[in-house]
A protein has these predicted regions:
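Short, basic/aromatic recognition patches
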Residues: 48-64
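Short glycine/Trp-rich loop-beta-loop segment that forms part of the substrate-binding cleft
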Residues: 45
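Non-catalytic accessory segments of DNA primases and related replication-initiation nucleases
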Residues: 1-42, 170
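Residue-level detector of short coil/turn "hinge" positions at structural boundaries
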Residues: 4, 48-49, 131, 190
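TOPRIM fold recognition
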Residues: 126-220
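Short Gly/charged-rich anion-binding patches and loops
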Residues: 36-37, 119, 174, 178
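Conserved hydrophobic helix-helix packing surfaces used for dimerization/oligomerization
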Residues: 29, 111-113, 162
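Phosphate-handling DNA/RNA-contact segment within nucleic-acid enzymes
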Residues: 62-155
Length: 220
């Protein structure tokens, strides 16, 4: 007949220990010319070295694993709450982190361009040559309550101008409409700035390609 056997012993899974967000951020390297994250941004994404250097100077970027880059999400007081993760084979957000806003440019700027990804915010800043009256922000994909609250705070500033610089697709239009409503409710001015291609990084790469061809055409 059937003889029951004692259950096989199994090791309890060891819980993964996550170090505090700020500690994990500080343990990562700062991108430098020629480093994996720097090459990803400048070679694969076409972002000028000068723009990446400014983002690094503002403390916004870190080296991620396997050649990826991390882009900081901070509260208005500067506290780090999470980061976007982007690489050739990877796209994600900090485990245990929170989405608020990636902020690139003058913190007190009255003009705020809202994008969906840090790379798009940096790309738009490059296209607009780091326009000095503009803060380029990213919600990190999606739309968290903290992101909306932060955008409302920016829109409530005196003479605030809210620019919906979201992607050129249906979801981008949905986010743009949310921004239009926020502007109407806070009294900020509003504009929709739509990339010609899918997103601002696509537009930047097209622009960089055209600029690279100009000397050849002139010599031709």
């Amino acid at each position: 007949g059937f003889v029951p056997s004692p259950p096989a012993w199994q090791r309890e899974p060891r819980p993964t220990t996550l170090h505090p967000i700020a500690d994990r951020w500080m343990r990562r390297g700062i991108p430098r010319p020629g480093s994996p994250a720097w090459r990803y941004l400048t070679v694969e994404r076409g972002i000028p070295d000068t723009i990446v250097a400014v983002a690094v100077e503002q403390g916004l970027l870190r080296e991620g694993p396997q050649g990826s880059m991390w882009a900081a999400h901070r509260r208005v007081d500067g506290a780090l709450v999470g980061w976007e993760e982007r690489g050739s084979q990877w796209r994600g957000f900090a485990t245990g982190g929170a989405k608020e806003l990636f902020r690139f440019g003058p913190a007190a700027a009255s003009r705020v361009c809202v994008t969906e990804a840090a790379i798009d915010a940096i790309s738009l800043a490059a296209i607009q040559v780091l326009r000095p009256d503009t803060l380029f922000v990213s919600t990190g994909g999606g739309w968290s309550p903290a992101s909306e609250e932060a955008i409302r705070g920016l829109a409530m500033r005196a003479d605030a101008r809210l620019v919906a610089a979201t992607d050129n697709n249906r979801q981008g239009d949905v986010y743009a409409e949310r921004l239009r409503v926020i502007a109407a409710e806070t009294g900020a001015s509003y504009a929709r700035s739509r990339p010609r291609a899918g997103d601002w990084n696509d537009d930047l790469k097209i622009l960089v390609g055209r600029l690279a061809e100009e000397p050849v055409a002139a010599a031709g």
